Amino acid sequence: MPKIKTHRGAAKRFKKTGTGKFRTKHAFLSHILEKKSAKRKRRLRKKFVLSAGDVRRIRAMIPY
């Protein structure tokens, strides 16, 4: 049976942590930033851990 291919788009967006969780960048920080507060933009700069429901899908896209 052939190996499962890694979804290259997902591989670029999600990184697996040592404990098996996935971290990714927040949305809403690429444009239209003038109306967003400095506090909101600062918080969006940090990475965040995906929820359990999303992890199931990402694990299928990034098997290795």
Curated annotation (Swiss-Prot):
UniProt xrefs under PANTHER family: 54S RIBOSOMAL PROTEIN BL35M, LARGE RIBOSOMAL SUBUNIT PROTEIN BL35M
Source organism, top-level taxon: Bacteria
MF annotations from Gene Ontology: structural constituent of ribosome
Span of the signal peptide: none
Species of origin: Desulforudis audaxviator (strain MP104C)
GO process annotations (BP): translation
Family annotation (SUPFAM superfamilies): L35p-like
Keywords (A to Z) from UniProt: Ribonucleoprotein, Ribosomal protein
Family: Belongs to the bacterial ribosomal protein bL35 family.
A Pfam family: Ribosomal_L35p
GO cellular component entries: cytosolic large ribosomal subunit
Taxonomic classification: Bacteria, Bacillati, Bacillota, Clostridia, Thermoanaerobacterales
Annotated TM spans: none
InterPro entries found in the cross-reference section: Ribosomal_bL35, Ribosomal_bL35-like, Ribosomal_bL35_CS, Ribosomal_bL35_sf
Record-given protein name: Large ribosomal subunit protein bL35
